[in-house]
Amino acid sequence: IIHEAGHEWFANNITYKDIADMWVHESFTTYSENLFLDYHYGNEAASDYVIGTRDGISNSSPMIGPYGVNKRGSDLYTKGANLLHTLRQIAKDDEIWRMILRGLNSEFYHQTVDTKQIEEFISSKIGFDLTTFFDQYLRDIRIPNLEYSISDGLLTYRWVDVIDNFTMPLEIEVLGENIWIYPTTKKKSIEINSDRIKIDRDYYVKSVKI
């Protein structure tokens, strides 16, 4: 019921020009289920719900389908919801996140849109260039993998299994303290007073310690 009601906003209010961009309908309405749980049962329960859907993501083809041939992409529901959940972590401010969701529906009120319009709107509101983020999650089938090592108090890290020049900030926990790192495809290092880190589970990413 929650999902279908969400289509009053993402489908009946905002719709796509080409079915290849069907994620604009299904990803947002799937994530509305998570927002419902967040409101009624709390953040932890909502996170458990959306993270629990990851086992059903196939990553067999990109979320955006080929244009002009009446074909949609794959994983529009569960991968799309996790894409949006990850974006919410990057925004790190639920007021901004609500403004984005409401703003999409006012900015594109009763319009047909393409993915680029949605991307540009969200990037402008979050204040971070999300070009490679969207290219990775919408147009590639790989999930970003944080490759890292810890030696002599130095954390060295980079993104692998990603498109060229991919960049995305990530929150990690070190000795109970949350800190931001800004990985790219090139190795970076910071000093930490621990031999382990914990990656925020709300990001739809993988990690490997080397």
Predicted segments, located by residue:
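Solvent-exposed loop and edge beta-strand segments that line ligand/cofactor-binding
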Residues: 19-21, 68-74
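Beta-strand-rich binding/interaction modules
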Residues: 130-131, 151-202
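Zinc-dependent metallopeptidase catalytic helix centered on the HExxH motif
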Residues: 1-47
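The feature captures the short pre-catalytic strand/loop hairpin that immediately precedes
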Residues: 56-70
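Amphipathic alpha-helical substructures
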Residues: 73-151, 155
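Short acidic/polar inter-strand loop motif in beta-rich domains
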Residues: 201-210
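Short helix/loop segments within enzyme catalytic domains
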Residues: 36-57, 96-100
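Generic recognition of well-ordered alpha-helical segments
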Residues: 28-35, 52, 83-86, 121
